[in-house]
Amino acid sequence: MNRPVFPVYHFLVSAAILVFVVIFWRTHHRDHRNWLALRLFVLCSVNRWPLRMVKGTVVGTTDTLREMQRYEQLSSTGLTTGKSSREHRYMIRLLLSLVRVCAGIICQCMTIPYQPHRG
């Protein structure tokens, strides 16, 4: 059963602040009331952002965990992309060849003796 924990907690904290304000307002002098009003404004303003921060962290962590599990599942079945492993190897070889050609051209332009990697 899924219970709305955060809204109930937020309501209880807000109700406790309200009760405290009413009691304090009736029992203290005007100078104390002005200072209290400023404090309560800050407290009530800050009361909302921790809730959003916690919710955002929980949701972000959950989404990241789901994505990791999905990636692991796709990796184990070999469905990470539509390309086969042969196509991947071909693309890697092509990229490495391009890098070697570019390195050779750069070394020629800079008059550095080029030594290709043997492997």
Curated annotation (Swiss-Prot):
GO terms for cellular component: plasma membrane. It comes from the Bacteria. Its EC number is 2.7.-.-. It is a multi-pass membrane protein. Keywords: Cell inner membrane, Cell membrane, Membrane, Transferase, Transmembrane, Transmembrane helix. One of its GO terms (molecular function) is transferase activity. It is found in: Cell inner membrane. It is an enzyme of class 2 (transferase). The chain crosses the membrane at residues 5-25, 94-114. Disulfide bonds: none annotated. Its main location: membrane. The keyword Plastid does not apply. Coiled coil: none annotated. Belongs to the phosphoethanolamine transferase family. This is Putative phosphoethanolamine transferase YjgX. The lineage of its organism: Bacteria, Pseudomonadati, Pseudomonadota, Gammaproteobacteria, Enterobacterales.
